[in-house]
C-alpha cells in the first residue's frame, strides 16, 4: 500500500513513483514541481494531498496515512480533518459523492468555490463546473446566490450548488447556467 505522511492539514506522498501512481488513478493531489501536469510522467517531485483527498484514498485502501511513524485509521484522519478544516464533514460528503460519480474533483478556492470539477482532466481541459457545498439547514439569501453566480460567470463555468442533508448524507445538486439572450 502507498504511504503518505501527514503534515499539518496535508498528506505528503514522498515516493515519486508512488505519487505518479496516485495521480494516474484520478488526478489526485498536487505535485510540488508543476501546477497542472498533462500526464503523470511530468511529475518529478513528491505529491501533496489534501486531507479530504487522503481520507477518500485511505477509505478506498489505496493509501495509508502515517503520523509519528505509525499508521492512523480513517476515524482519526477524519477527526484531524474536522479539527483543521472548517466545514470538513460537509466538504468530504460532497467530494466523496462527486468522486463516486467519476468526476475529477479539485480545489475551487481560486475561483471562490469549494471545488472545481472536470469531466476529463486538469491540464487537458478547463474545469466546466464550480461546486459550492451548502448544508440543507443553512439559509442563503438571493444575494448570496447572485454572488456565487457572478464568480462562475466571470470564469465561464457552470455553478453547481450541492445541498447536503447531514443526517442521511443525501445530496441534491442544482446547476445554474448563464444564458445570453
Curated annotation (Swiss-Prot):
Belongs to the tRNA-intron endonuclease family. Archaeal short subfamily. It catalyses: pretRNA = a 3'-half-tRNA molecule with a 5'-OH end + a 5'-half-tRNA molecule with a 2',3'-cyclic phosphate end + an intron with a 2',3'-cyclic phosphate and a 5'-hydroxyl terminus. One of its GO terms (molecular function) is nucleic acid binding. Endonuclease that removes tRNA introns. Cleaves pre-tRNA at the 5'- and 3'-splice sites to release the intron. The products are an intron and two tRNA half-molecules bearing 2',3' cyclic phosphate and 5'-OH termini. Recognizes a pseudosymmetric substrate in which 2 bulged loops of 3 bases are separated by a stem of 4 bp. The keyword Lyase applies. Keywords: Lyase, tRNA processing. It comes from the Archaea. Homotetramer; although the tetramer contains four active sites, only two participate in the cleavage. Therefore, it should be considered as a dimer of dimers. This is tRNA-splicing endonuclease. The active site is at 118, 126, 157. GO terms for biological process: tRNA splicing, via endonucleolytic cleavage and ligation. Its EC number is 4.6.1.16. InterPro entries: tRNA_endonuc-like_dom_sf, tRNA_intron_Endo_cat-like_sf, tRNA_intron_Endonuc_cat-like, tRNA_intron_Endonuc_N, tRNA_intron_Endonuc_N_sf, tRNA_splic, tRNA_splic_arch_short. The keyword Lyase applies. SUPFAM superfamilies: tRNA-intron endonuclease catalytic domain-like, tRNA-intron endonuclease N-terminal domain-like. Pfam families: tRNA_int_endo, tRNA_int_endo_N. One of its GO terms (cellular component) is cytoplasm.
Amino acid at each position: 500500500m502507498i504511504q503518505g505522511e501527514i503534515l499539518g492539514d496535508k498528506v505528503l506522498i514522498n515516493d515519486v513513483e508512488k505519487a505518479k501512481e496516485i495521480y494516474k488513478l484520478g488526478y489526485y493531489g498536487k505535485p510540488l514541481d508543476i501546477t497542472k501536469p498533462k500526464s503523470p510522467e511530468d511529475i518529478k517531485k513528491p505529491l501533496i494531498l489534501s486531507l479530504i483527498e487522503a481520507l477518500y484514498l485511505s477509505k478506498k485502501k489505496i493509501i495509508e496515512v502515517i503520523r509519528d511513524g505509525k499508521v492512523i485509521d480513517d476515524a482519526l484522519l477524519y477527526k484531524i480533518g474536522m479539527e483543521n478544516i472548517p466545514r470538513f464533514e460537509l466538504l468530504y460528503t460532497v467530494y466523496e459523492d462527486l468522486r463516486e460519480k467519476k468526476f475529477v474533483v479539485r480545489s475551487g478556492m481560486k475561483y471562490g468555490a469549494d471545488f472545481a470539477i472536470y469531466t476529463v482532466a486538469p491540464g487537458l481541459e478547463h474545469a466546466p463546473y464550480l461546486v459550492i457545498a451548502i448544508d440543507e439547514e443553512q439559509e442563503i439569501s438571493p444575494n448570496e446566490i447572485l454572488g456565487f453566480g457572478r464568480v462562475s460567470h466571470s470564469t465561464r463555468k457552470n455553478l453547481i450548488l450541492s445541498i447536503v442533508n447531514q443526517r442521511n448524507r443525501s445530496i441534491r445538486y442544482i446547476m445554474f447556467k448563464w444564458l445570453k439572450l
